[in-house]
């Protein structure tokens, strides 16, 4: 009997190991086929990573890679976040009612026309979950924010890339690319990474000209930097199929809290809410965002500082005989000849910038920093490009 138990135990263990090994070996076969070739988004390098890699003091590193607000969040937003810490044992308000109400008052819309996201990236993903099926088409600019393409591929849709002459979205070409399979069109204005923007008039005309089976998605991540931003609210009130997306990560300085929002018709937002995960925006982010939205003086101050920083960088780049793309946002796309090499050389000096994909491989993107950070970046550029 004891020998039988030994044999049974040995057989069971062998069988278990064999099946575990088979399960592990076949893991990719169990995955959604689309995930296997899915590119992974690469964010800007973190200060801690660069400090460790190059043995630098983190305090001496300038992170000019991710278009963050170098002056930080509004003091009132920071205070509101600290106060919210006392209640982190509780789940956040699931619908974000107070924040949606604050946003709706700011925009002159109803709160049920607002959807909150864990960053505006989540809103982009929700659009895919709700509207895209395999074989659908999504129209994007050649040099637009890469997440539109990544999301489309993950959903089984086909991203249709439209050339951007002079690094500006060609709305006529985008319109000509529409087919009966087109579901979504993404237009970021200002655009990341080029910093270019289409005029409000042409954006509104484009949105009004779209056929009924197409949803127009205007990414307004950098809209607070524009003197004359487009306004989709009249089209939204008409019930048109448009959605605008904004973030608290840029001028509001809340990138670390991951919070953004979209606004559109009640019907469109109601559909997106069906795909939204419960408690997707944490309580600290909600509290800080409400305070940030109210502090319009801080936003105006940061906008003015950014304008000054753009002028400082533009003058410095001209003195270095470097070409750049005039920007409507809080960064500059700079032609340095060899983008990857320059990125690495600057990084070794404690200046973190952003290298570009193959289609823009002669450029690096440099976020506007404080006056001192801009000065350090220009000095480092002069050193590495001599």
Task: Mark where each language-model region is.
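N-terminal small-domain helix-loop-helix segment of the aminotransferase-like
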Residues: 26-121, 126
